Amino acid sequence: VIGGEPLMNKKWAEITNGILDQDPNRTVYIFTNATICPKDEQLETFKGRNVHFYITDYDKLSRNMDRVIEALNKHDIPYYRKPAGNWVDCSRIRKHNRTIPRLKQVFKECCAKQLYTLLSGKLYTCPFISNAANLKAIPDNKADYVDLFSNSDNLKNKIRKLVKMKNFFPACDFCDGRPHAPEKALEYAGKGLIKAGKQIPISSSLPFQEYK
């Protein structure tokens, strides 16, 4: 369960339990930056369930780190704590006009192509695509998602095709790339690694024109 910060959603515990209700044997990982401390009554609902916390430590920015650790220990919830380190610059939205082989390489190198995202009734495999579409920063292309509210008779087949995608999505051409190792990636067009918690200044308010 990822965000932003998932604990900002008041129903985060309810959502997590809903995922586990579908398959009680699975393990759910909740990613947090320890800016918000979960409530005791929320953590109590995970008793006997496979819930783990993955805590990214941003030093002073993770202002509730001690409280979060104390709460997780109190409720015997496993956690993993890791320093934030660096971010990969991949925030710009722009059309690259890549060839098909280059698009396949972008997709091959991507670390976010299996981060399934449900937004406004549409299922995506990539949070970049879902958020760019929500901002209307990229053209609406039905090949990028599955509309779960559609009246299609072959919805299951569409979902299966989406999650098994091996080539690329049309929206990949608007992405700088999300490689595991930007220094080695062949098709990465961002600015490399930046210190976690720091933002790259943007000269204009929006780096794209709205698509309609």
Positions of PLM-derived features:
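ER/Golgi luminal nucleotide-sugar-dependent glycosyltransferases, focusing on the catalytic module
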Residues: 212
